Amino acid sequence: MSKRALISVSDKTNIIEFAKGLKESGFEILSTGGTLRSIAEAGIDVTPVDEVTGFPEMLDGRVKTLHPMIHGGLLGKRSNHEHLSQMEEHGIRSIDLVAVNLYPFKETVQKPDVSHQDIIENIDIGGPSMLRSAAKNFEDVLVVTGPTDYNRVLAAITSETDTYEFRQQLAAKVFRHTASYDAMIANYFLSQTEEQYPESYTVTYEKVQDLRYGENPHQQAAFYKEPIQSRPTLATAKQLHGKELSYNNIQDTNAAIEIVKEFAEPAAVAVKHMNPCGIGIGESISTAFERAYQADPTSIFGGIVACNRPVDAATAEQLSQIFLEIVVAPSFESQALEILTQKKNIRLLELDVTSDNKQSNRLTTVDGGALIQAYDAKEVSEADLEVVTNKQPTEQEINDMLFAWKAVKHVKSNAIVLAKDSQTIGVGAGQMNRIGAAEIAIKQAGDKSEGAVLASDAFFPMPDTVEAAAKAGIKAIIQPGGSKRDQDSVDVCNQFGIAMVYTKVRHFKH
């Protein structure tokens, strides 16, 4: 008795060639719906599934293969005499190969203006059931999820590569595939509710590429993306020039994108090791970049730059004068591309860095688990500021403080940022005490600190940071407030004529 293969696919790529190969290898082919028609129209002998089940397709195609004649043929173990006896008793023949790919749920849910009903109708039921049945019984059933495996399976059928390990590999692929498919469906339904943190949280990612290594050469790594992309992200960026991104490139570029999205004005951000080394805003992207560069001309070397406006020729000339790993921007003018592509080692990424990302959850893995939290989207405006000192800040100081506040939000805690005239001039990042971060920022700013403002991501537990700021000539301070010793810091500000405002918002970043 000939072997049987059941084929039911939504993606018809190379399916005719695969069916011909199976036929040449002696398989009887069973099929349904559009796949059946395609195979038959190609002149290949094919048996409709309803001839096997004795039931027609029904409920608008919702029920085709959900039948014991199909699943018995997939799940019956050939080495189990009781299974074989029961199959013979009920007239069930074995099915030896299944080729199924699923309804295009992912593609459907990403269509603009798609209806909820269309999304529902693209949830596959029979397909995953057949795949899982076949994969469970992988010792007896070859299972194929897509065109990339057709040639491998055809080769295995006629050679010694049809091994236990090969079949188990295909089965593992099935369970990853159906788990990912179900995760996308689960997350779609979750998005239709107000529930944020359910009892179980399902995520799935698709591989973008293997990476040369991770943070260090001895660490293996790969880059994955969310399968459903509802907004522009680094994973959807278009690379216009340069070699592939490294693990550290991806981390740093994402950090730069997160920061530059804070600003409505033309802005440029330079990042090293996921911390900003320079941020500038201006009336043009060229001016903004010049300010970001001058913020720290040393640290920007080998860094990543993000711009929230198209890169023009003037800005490209500035960028080309220094060694940069990556420049990411909404677009690059043709002259800018001509200038920058002359540098072999630079990567150019095109991405809409003005899109909103403030509604998304963020996931961080820990050993044995994960932390999930809402994106830190809290914004502070001039109206939110509480002046707590005798001195009132000037309009310029308020503007600089709000600018510095946006910057310090993205600096690793403990974080201090000094700013002046729409430009960061000192960044103290990742220190175990706040005064240490302040000392680093003040030292970096040097003489520029005279008349500058200081932003702190959290409150001052003692007045030492304010004292250091006073010695450096800082004229205004923005911080959350909330310490038991707030008044000590206020007193020092009043002593030295410094304006200080509270935001009542903390921006820890780990």
UniProtKB/Swiss-Prot annotation:
<keyword id="KW-0658">Purine biosynthesis</keyword>
<comment type="similarity">
    <text>Belongs to the PurH family.</text>
</comment>
<protein>
    <recommendedName>
        <fullName>Bifunctional purine biosynthesis protein PurH</fullName>
        <ecNumber>2.1.2.3</ecNumber>
        <ecNumber>3.5.4.10</ecNumber>
    </recommendedName>
</protein>
<dbReference type="InterPro" id="IPR011607">
    <property type="entry name" value="MGS-like_dom"/>
</dbReference>
<keyword id="KW-0378">Hydrolase</keyword>
<dbReference type="InterPro" id="IPR002695">
    <property type="entry name" value="PurH-like"/>
</dbReference>
<dbReference type="GO" id="GO:0003937">
    <property type="term" value="F:IMP cyclohydrolase activity"/>
</dbReference>
<dbReference type="InterPro" id="IPR016193">
    <property type="entry name" value="Cytidine_deaminase-like"/>
</dbReference>
<comment type="pathway">
    <text>Purine metabolism; IMP biosynthesis via de novo pathway; 5-formamido-1-(5-phospho-D-ribosyl)imidazole-4-carboxamide from 5-amino-1-(5-phospho-D-ribosyl)imidazole-4-carboxamide (10-formyl THF route): step 1/1.</text>
</comment>
<dbReference type="GO" id="GO:0005829">
    <property type="term" value="C:cytosol"/>
</dbReference>
<dbReference type="GO" id="GO:0004643">
    <property type="term" value="F:phosphoribosylaminoimidazolecarboxamide formyltransferase activity"/>
</dbReference>
<dbReference type="GO" id="GO:0006189">
    <property type="term" value="P:'de novo' IMP biosynthetic process"/>
</dbReference>
<comment type="pathway">
    <text>Purine metabolism; IMP biosynthesis via de novo pathway; IMP from 5-formamido-1-(5-phospho-D-ribosyl)imidazole-4-carboxamide: step 1/1.</text>
</comment>
<keyword id="KW-0511">Multifunctional enzyme</keyword>
<feature type="domain" description="MGS-like">
    <location>
        <begin position="1"/>
        <end position="145"/>
    </location>
</feature>
<keyword id="KW-0808">Transferase</keyword>
<dbReference type="InterPro" id="IPR024051">
    <property type="entry name" value="AICAR_Tfase_dup_dom_sf"/>
</dbReference>
<dbReference type="Pfam" id="PF01808">
    <property type="entry name" value="AICARFT_IMPCHas"/>
</dbReference>
<dbReference type="Pfam" id="PF02142">
    <property type="entry name" value="MGS"/>
</dbReference>
<dbReference type="InterPro" id="IPR036914">
    <property type="entry name" value="MGS-like_dom_sf"/>
</dbReference>
